[in-house]
Amino acid sequence: MKKSLHICLVFLLMMIYTHTGIAQATHPEPKTLEIGAKAPDFNLLGVDGKMYNLNSFNNSAVLVIIFSCNHCPTAQAYEDRIISLTNDYKSKGVAVVVISPNSVKALNLAELGYTDMGDSYEEMKLRAADKGFPFPYLFDGEQQKTALAYGPAATPHCFVFDKNRILCYCGRVDGAEKPGTGKGEDIRNAINSVLAGTAVKVPVTKVFGCSVKWSWKDEYTAKLYQQWAELPVTLEDIDVQGIKDLVKNPSSGKLRLINIWATWCGPCVTEFPDLVIIDRMYRGRPFEFITISADKQARKADVLNFLKKQQASNKNYIFNKEDVYQMIEAVDPEWQGALPYTLVVEPGGKIIYKKQDMINPANMKKLIVEDKSIGRYY
């Protein structure tokens, strides 16, 4: 018996050691490239559909590689400065390249509260078009080989290389995150020194921003989604006055997305998952998602069952009267009555959006994040 237990214990320890060894070998701790190091080559797809490597920039005296992304509020705060940097130094033989290092698998919806887009390749194309990026915007989120080779600590993180592609500067764009306060002083000083052939006075700085979303660090995402799945889903009755109060939004201090729907409405059911995603993106901000079911009270159990399947842990109501026209007038006298119907109401009652039909999820996210009560930056 003791011998059997000993054999089992040895086998268990071997399994733990083997698993740990494999994990460490597969997922090394990324190390930031050191000053004086040669630029590692890469082969990455740009949002323009072209492949890029170091040789793509052979004609440039200075190569600036910036690891950044769509979703991070700090990265977004620096977008315009990186655009200006690119335009200002293009004629001086400086090439700016931006690489998105993040794995989509490790990026969860709660981390998208300051953006309208995630970090997928398709969303990168949309952001580049929306902002008019004048630089190559490359995707490394699939294998993250380039990010591992360079070791960015956060987004954004800048690497400046001379004509021999030796690293001369590694660090921040500047020390003032808020748009309008900084002009990219740190990276501009570094580029100017490299162009002049002189040593960069401050070759390394710390960086501030969002951590890189490594593909193997997705435990928190799985845990968060499980927590969301376990949140209680409720359905309460609401009367005419209650609906009017919701639309007035007098004291919540939150931007309200109000959706009127029904279980028998095909478009309502079709768009509902997108509304849940939007709620999960922005529920950590001054935002709340509210649904009002136009189903009859006799179908209350069916409504709740649908909401539970959707994991709709937001505020959910069902109109408590038989006369649906009272509900229509309470929501919006201008509403014709067709479902779905969606409102976005600022704190204080200003309606900034209303639509009788399905929403466009991408447009809705942009509307929300660019509202004065939400915003893209800290």
Predicted regions and their residues:
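Bacterial Sec-dependent N-terminal signal peptides
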Residues: M1-T26
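Short N-terminal segments immediately surrounding and downstream of signal-peptide cleavage
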Residues: A25-G46
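A short beta-strand-turn-helix
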Residues: F42-L63, L235-R256, V276-M281, I328
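Short pre-active-site segment immediately N-terminal to redox-active cysteine/selenocysteine motifs
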Residues: A61-L63, S68-H71, K254-R256, W261-W264, ...
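Conserved redox-active cysteine motifs that mediate thiol-disulfide chemistry
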Residues: S68-R81, I260-I277
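Thiol-based oxidoreductase modules, predominantly thioredoxin-like and allied folds used
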Residues: G93-G118, F133-Q143, P286-K300, A312-D323
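Short, internal strand/loop/helix patches
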Residues: D116-T155, F159-V160, C168, L304-L339
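Thiol-/selenol-based redox modules, centered on thioredoxin-like
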Residues: D162-I238, L339-Y378
